[in-house]
Amino acid sequence: EAANESDNYAPDANNSALIGKTFTLRSGSSGVLNHATQVGKRMYGTDGVGLAPGVTDINVYSAVGWTQSNYLRFGTGSNPSTPPGNIELFNNSWVASFGNFGYDNEVLARGDWAIDAHNVMMLNGVTTADEHVPLMCFGFNCVSVGASDGTHTSGTVPTGYHQAGMQVPLIVAAQGTTSNATGVVSAITALLVETRETHPNTSGNFFAGFSETMKAVLLTGGNHSNSWTNNPILSGPNRGRTNQPIDAIYGVGTANIDNSHRVLTGGQFASDTSTVGLGSAPTAGWDTTTLTNGQSKYIKFSVASLADEVSIVLTWHQQANTGFGSYSLADLNLELLHYNGGKPTSLTGDAGIGVFGSGNCISESEIDTVEHLYLKNLSAGEYVVKMSRSDSAAGARVCSLGWLFPEQDASVPGDLNGDGTVDVNDLLVIIAGWGVCSGECPADLSGDGLVDVSDILLLLSYWS
């Protein structure tokens, strides 16, 4: 919390919504600061005020103390301190700058190092001023947060910073200030942590506890408004490509606990270095894996009916080097491919026309640590997501992929006559419907408006 002129930075422990909470003041004694109280209420307040009322133990820092002696240790030759207890996340509902590129860059690098080394999440608010303020929202590894009304400062990080060109914010929330919006996103993250510890699909899963996993889960669930765009190329041979993974104002969209809960509890589904013999992933889920230089990994998806929207997010950490003056930068890319007869084929250009209505099938930023695919009206069929790495940094890099497809009916894909199996009777349905579709056309499995050999091939891939 940014302390006031009296050095007060603490929430009001006597506020009715905060009764029963234990506050540990890590930056020394403090009086009450209303800003801290209001943000805290939205995070962990009781009586229906906060989203995560089950949070009872809160460590409170002043912004100065947190960046300097109490945690990040800026101004010393030491690494950031180990967080006390079992801290999972830091909420930074403040902005600041030392007024010096070198100082600000070091603080940001210390924050990125701490996220990676201490396996924590940092939810950092962006400013509403006319110009960007770097601390702490410029961090590679953090989650930068804006307000869903778009009143925050947005766009790309300016020159002078290691992150120059990177997009901020990553996500927004429906609050009147970015401070409160950051608190809401922190509360959603806390709920996801609680779910992770108790749900049978994640409890005991080592990779579920990675901060990369939690970041991917959070971002994949963002709600995209009708005006949302990551500016994909709309026509020509590069239709479907973008090097701007997220919306310039709203990031991945508005944080949504229900969507992110689906992604998290869908569980981990392992990617593979080969496209041969892949099983189909669930409609929502995640994977946390590693990629080395030049390596690619794949996950297959079977889409039984037209998917009105699909969200896929890949994220990873950049590693701050010793001394916090530079980084080891990894560059990952993300692509959705058609899976025809067990062979991946590109959806860029004309190949994607009739397969997806709008959006991007390739995300290939050179600076962001998030790649995002967002497609509307994806036709029924089989697809693979390709994660790839193209840089010269040494060693393997942990990365996390989250995905969210529409929930599918319990019906068996390809079961056109509804008898629970895919067999010759379903083939007869395709033959009976051969040609151009008119009206409802269940035999058009590929969704291209024709019942033809492509539908037979797709049916055979579902054969019981």
For the regions a protein language model found, what residue spans apply to each?
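Cellulosome-associated attachment modules in secreted, modular CAZymes
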Residues: 405-464
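C-terminal edge strands of extracellular/lumenal beta-sandwich accessory domains
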Residues: 210, 214-215, 297-299, 335-341, ...
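Secreted peptidase-domain scaffold signal
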Residues: 237-332, 338, 400-410
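Surface-exposed beta-strand/loop patches in noncatalytic accessory domains
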Residues: 327-367
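Short glycine/serine- and small hydrophobic-enriched flexible loop segments
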Residues: 41-45, 186-198, 220, 305, ...
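Acidic glycine-/aspartate-rich tracts in secreted/extracellular proteins
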Residues: 2-6, 149-151, 223-226, 317-319, ...
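Subtilisin-like serine protease catalytic core
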Residues: 1-71, 83-89, 99-103, 117-121, ...
